[in-house]
Amino acid sequence: GAGPSGLSAAYQLAVRGHEVEIRDAMAEPGGMMRYGIPEYRLPRAVLDAEVARLVELGVVITCNTKIDDLLAEQAEGDFDAVFVAIGAHLSKRVDIPNMDAGHMVDAVTFLRDVASGNRPEIGKRVAIYGAGNTAMDAARVARRLGADDSIIIYRRTQEQMPAHVEEMEGAEREGVKMNWLR
């Protein structure tokens, strides 16, 4: 995989003189840095420059390539070792009553779709359940996609939110509303 750990491992191996190849299922390298972190937080030019540094070191990156049989791939490629960097791109599951009653999507999928150019259809009012940094990103992106109201709903108090205060403040500056436990 060409996400953070795969790219980091490739760099460490390449600077030590090893020949390195990366295979990734996505269209472009970067993993969650490209598909989970909004561009306003991590400009794609910065990420692309880091990937270009790896290529300059001789790292071969092949995208749009899913590995179905790791052992066969290792044998066919005559690799001495394989580092499996499959990523951590899953959202936390929460039990929300009537979750199947309306259009609901997890924040990671929403952010990945936006980053991939697949603009999701959103309504004028968007509710985000949770108050972590990913929730703040999703709320801000919803506003940028045209939502009139983007509301963070959190089951605890503001003091208990896992997001960094500056992330909350940035979201509020963009018009995101916060609904805390009272």
Feature locations, PLM:
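Extreme N-terminal leader/targeting segments of oxidoreductases
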Residues: V15, D48-A52, A101-A107
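Glycine-rich, phosphate-binding/catalytic loops in enzymes
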Residues: R16, E39, M99-G102, L145
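Rossmann-like dinucleotide-binding cores of NAD(P)H-dependent redox enzymes
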Residues: I22, M26-L57, I61, V114, ...
